[in-house]
């Protein structure tokens, strides 16, 4: 009985790792030059933005981006570059903006890779 219980616990632990969901990966952009009229959007929290953000970036947290982007009078054809800490929230923002009709949204991934892409 003890061995069966141990086997069940080991199997449960192994299967728990299998159902954790897909791993997120973000491919950084290479050598980005912001075109005139493009908008650089930091989709992190206010606290993260206050600690560090890219020059020229505006803060619009990812969970409220579709509510706040119209306040910036952004044309739906404008180019929007979004970034966060790792690229995950920026990807959520990109999908939300695409669903709202914005088609030129580019995920710069995390702030470090975005900074590097813009500096090249």
Region locations from a protein language model:
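Secretory targeting signatures
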Residues: 1-17
């Amino acid at each position: 009985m003890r061995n069966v219980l141990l086997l069940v616990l080991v199997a449960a632990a192994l299967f728990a790792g299998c159902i954790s969901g897909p791993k997120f990966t973000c491919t950084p952009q290479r050598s980005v030059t912001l075109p005139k009229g493009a908008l650089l959007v930091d989709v992190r929290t206010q606290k993260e933005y206050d600690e560090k953000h890219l020059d020229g970036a505006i803060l619009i947290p990812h969970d409220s981006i579709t509510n706040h982007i119209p306040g910036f009078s952004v044309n739906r054809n404008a180019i929007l570059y979004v970034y966060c800490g790792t690229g995950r929230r920026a990807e959520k923002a990109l999908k939300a903006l695409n669903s709202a009709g914005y088609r030129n949204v580019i995920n710069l991934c995390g702030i470090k890779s975005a900074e590097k892409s813009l500096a090249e």
